[in-house]
Amino acid sequence: MTIRIAINGFGRIGRSVVRALYESGKTDLFTLVSINELAPASGIAHLLKYDSTHGRFPFSVSEKENQLIINGDEIALTHIGNLNSLPWQQQNIDIVLDCTGKYGNKADGLSHINRGAKKVLFSHPGSQDIDATIIYGINHQTLTSSDRVVSNGSCTTNCIVPVIKVIDEAFGVESGSITTIHSSMHDQQVIDAYHKDLRLSRAASQSIIPVDTKLAAGIERILPKFKGRFEAIAVRVPTINVTAMDLSLTVNNDVCICDINQAIQAATSNHDLYGVLSYTEEPLVSVDFNHDPHSCIVDGNQTRVSHKRLIKMLVWCDNEWGFANRMLDTAMAMHQAEN
């Protein structure tokens, strides 16, 4: 029996999840029952079919009254703004993938459950009161049947935590710092316009823009041993997709570049990290990682070691596509924890 899922919020991540579901052939594992999005059906269908970042969707898409039809599959389409009015019970939903970016606390999750969903997975960091934050490949094995309100973390946490964990297990990590070099996002302006964050009021295509980040807190949440030992900053750059992470680590043992790269290469075949962590030595640029399903790709040519214990690494991710694939992986892990 397939897992019956609904998607609440059909923006960049919601649409990427649907694309990943069909393009990966996982429709034999999941049944997409319902999509709830305030936008009109014509816009929903059009932006699923045509995407400036990921190209044309290679499956048929059409819409009719209250339905989106993908590759012949009829998916209920609703436009409900109140969580307390969603039709999950009537639709017998197993897991809601909440991709709005608007909700993220336990009460929000329970609103979905009170409407009939069995479980909820947020596509962004959740508050401290939710049942679990999962970085697939790192702690998805800890899920239990009682974890009903779950967060998939952030794209950057999914990108960096596997690398930190591998290096820590191999050499021992003392502390670290990270600079996230992130593509533009929907909260930025096309041209200068008012925004409460004055830096975000500037045109996205014209500047490298420093922004706030809670990445260090996200690392501590998954790897609590590092509490107070990581710092992070972030900038947005004028590209529409793919993120690079500039990672610096101080380790407890003497290492060389080969040691670091070999540890990463070995970890890519680890059962939990297979399909999550990747490694390359090709001379690639950011666009080459567009539509890459991994959470993190280590660029071995950029690994550096200073004074035997200070490591610098460059880690890439498609901040949309990799994360969308992990949403499906985590949803599957939530279902398996129930059985």
Curated annotation (Swiss-Prot):
GO MF term set: erythrose-4-phosphate dehydrogenase activity; NAD binding
Main subcellular localisation: cytoplasm
Annotated NAD(+) binding sites: 12-13, 319
A biological process from GO: pyridoxal phosphate biosynthetic process
Site keyed Activates thiol group during catalysis: positions: 182
GO cellular component: cytoplasm
Signal sequence bounds: none
Biological or metabolic pathway of the protein: Cofactor biosynthesis; pyridoxine 5'-phosphate biosynthesis; pyridoxine 5'-phosphate from D-erythrose 4-phosphate: step 1/5
InterPro entries to which the protein is assigned, alphabetical: E4P_DH_bac (IPR006422), GlycerAld/Erythrose_P_DH (IPR020831), GlycerAld_3-P_DH_cat (IPR020829), GlycerAld_3-P_DH_NAD(P)-bd (IPR020828), NAD(P)-bd_dom_sf (IPR036291)
UniProt keyword annotations, A-Z: Cytoplasm, NAD, Oxidoreductase, Pyridoxine biosynthesis
Annotated Pfam families: Gp_dh_C, Gp_dh_N
Subcellular location(s) of the protein: Cytoplasm
Chain residues that bind substrate: 154-156, 213-214, 236
Domain of life: Bacteria
UniProt cross-references to HAMAP family, sorted A to Z: E4P_dehydrog (MF_01640)
Family recorded in the similarity comment: Belongs to the glyceraldehyde-3-phosphate dehydrogenase family. Epd subfamily.
Alphabetical list of NCBIfam families matching this protein: E4PD_g-proteo, PRK13535.1
Name of the molecule in the record: D-erythrose-4-phosphate dehydrogenase
Organism this protein belongs to: Colwellia psychrerythraea (strain 34H / ATCC BAA-681)
Gene name, Swiss-Prot/TrEMBL: epd
